[in-house]
Amino acid sequence: MSTVLRFGIPKGSLEEATVDLFKQAGWQIGISSRSYFPTVDDGEMKCHLIRPQEMGKYVERGTIDVGIAGRDWIRENDSDVVEVCEMVYSKVSRRPVRWVLVVAQDSPVQGPEDLQGATISTELVEFTKRYFKERNIQVNVEFSWGATEAKVVDGLCDAIVEVTETGSTIRANNLRIVCDLMESVPVMVANKAAWEDPWKRAKIEQIATLLNSALRAEGMVGLKLNAPAEKVEAITGILPSQKAPTVAHLYKSDWVSIESILPEKEVRRIVPELLRLGAEGIIEYPLSKII
């Protein structure tokens, strides 16, 4: 049994966000511009820098045991892998991206069915072919090497299938979204044989748990305070929490200590109310993980 887990780090737009997420979860990953083999402070892991577009096939073959890539590229390659978990993060935000069907603003196209016999340009060729084939719409799908939005503007194709988070670039180029084809988030995928290996599966699950706990902690803080015991109901009534605030009596005192986890943006609203109710010694502290 191998005691090293081969992990694929997505190269490109997700690279920095992934390294930052690992750091928050407890792993230090170092990436050199001169190497495709990142360093990691875990003797049980070996990291590989791999394009998300190719992650699925390398995981399926067993070249690597597990990796992170967008679900869009896993579906594009129709990869036969185990989806361990979703991990909702991206280069811009913590929300899914969308693959959308786009035409020029003045195009008469109102739906996919209006593109019968049309030429569509995209990076997501195989998925797009399947999408239209399932709807009995005959189209010519061409691979785009980049600058896809410009092609429909220049009349080089009738429509494009492009990825977006906010749609702002599409609107800025005087283009119009016809419909959404797919929503995608990063997913952790594992090789089937690796998933059946007890040691590797346990290691994969450990990593997945800690990465997702780091995601859950983003934007959250801990708040701790002391208050008179008679104010507990009033204070816990305004204090958000994961389940219920923790309340503990102070030693030889009729005061209590109250602790809770809440969104950071709520602190500025709640602190004045806590002070008004007699709270003292209010401490706000950052969270790296919520498990």
Curated annotation (Swiss-Prot):
EC number: 2.4.2.17
Catalytic activity entry: 1-(5-phospho-beta-D-ribosyl)-ATP + diphosphate = 5-phospho-alpha-D-ribose 1-diphosphate + ATP
Predominant place of localization: cytoplasm
Keyword field: Amino-acid biosynthesis, ATP-binding, Cytoplasm, Glycosyltransferase, Histidine biosynthesis, Magnesium, Metal-binding, Nucleotide-binding, Transferase
Major enzyme class: transferase
GO biological process, one term: L-histidine biosynthetic process
GO molecular function: ATP binding; ATP phosphoribosyltransferase activity; magnesium ion binding
Record comment: activity regulation: Feedback inhibited by histidine.
GO cellular component terms attached to this protein's record: cytoplasm
Cysteine-cysteine disulfides: none
Cited function: Catalyzes the condensation of ATP and 5-phosphoribose 1-diphosphate to form N'-(5'-phosphoribosyl)-ATP (PR-ATP). Has a crucial role in the pathway because the rate of histidine biosynthesis seems to be controlled primarily by regulation of HisG enzymatic activity.
Family the UniProt entry places it in: Belongs to the ATP phosphoribosyltransferase family. Long subfamily.
Protein name listed in UniProt: ATP phosphoribosyltransferase
Organism: Trichlorobacter lovleyi (strain ATCC BAA-1151 / DSM 17278 / SZ) (Geobacter lovleyi)
Encoding gene, per UniProt annotation: hisG
